């Protein structure tokens, strides 16, 4: 069992919206695919990850530092103790080799995007949704089905006036949200 390839692409976010800090039409997003030699339903298992909007894609960091470290590591060193799956913590440690400790933002985005794809692959190899895998590994096996969520909105669209913004916020409340982040 091993990671056979990690692909990354950085693309522009095609959105005309902005908030008080960020014009999303100028932002980029990184997408990552972690390919494995594990086959499920006749296809290789592939885990996917992406960085959130509001953060620039970090493809250069991934391609120059973090992806090579994972692919150059001994594949056996990235397997969990059962020998049946990848170990996200060992993969994270491989990515963090020769890095100064700390949570520098751009680096965190790069590592976090790959880490998301690794966890997706691990859950697929295990044959479980990620939320169940996490509940099994780090909880009592019973996922909490009640999760706090909020509506994110209030972005400035070209031509949007305060009336439309008010209508948008009201629509979130009408749909049952109790908290709106703008």
Segments and roles (model prediction):
Residues 1, 112, 175:
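Structured loop/turn residues at beta-strand edges in well-structured enzyme cores
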Residues 13, 28-40, 46, 68-79, ...:
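Short regulatory "switch" loops immediately downstream of catalytic or recognition motifs
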Residues 1-55, 59:
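Structured beta-strand/loop patches that form or line metal/cofactor-binding pockets in enzymes
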Residues 29-31, 113, 146, 179:
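Broad gene-expression machinery/nucleic-acid interaction feature
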Residues 39-125:
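Metal- or metallocofactor-binding catalytic centers and their adjacent structured scaffolds
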Residues 109, 115-158:
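Glycine-rich, aromatic-flanked loop segments that form ligand/cofactor-binding clefts
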Residues 140-182:
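Metal-dependent enolase-superfamily TIM-barrel catalytic cores that perform enediolate-based chemistry
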Residues 26-28, 63, 143:
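A short, structural micro-pattern
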């Amino acid at each position: 069992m091993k990671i056979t390839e990690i692909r990354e692409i950085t693309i522009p976010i095609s959105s005309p919206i902005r908030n008080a800090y960020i014009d999303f039409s100028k932002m980029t997003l990184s997408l990552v695919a972690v390919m494995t030699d594990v086959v499920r339903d006749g296809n290789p298992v592939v885990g996917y990850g992406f960085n959130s909007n509001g953060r620039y894609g970090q493809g250069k960091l991934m391609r120059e530092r973090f992806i090579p470290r994972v692919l150059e590591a001994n594949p056996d060193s990235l397997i969990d103790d059962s020998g049946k799956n990848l170990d996200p913590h060992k993969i994270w440690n491989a990515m963090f080799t020769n890095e100064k400790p700390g949570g520098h933002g751009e680096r965190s985005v790069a590592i976090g995007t790959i880490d998301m794809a690794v966890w997706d692959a691990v859950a697929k190899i295990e044959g479980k949704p990620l939320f169940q895998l996490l509940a099994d590994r780090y909880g009592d096996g019973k996922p909490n089905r009640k999760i706090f969520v909020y509506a994110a909105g209030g972005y400035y669209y070209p031509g949007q006036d305060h009336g439309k913004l008010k209508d948008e916020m009201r629509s979130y409340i009408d749909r049952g949200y109790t908290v709106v982040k703008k």
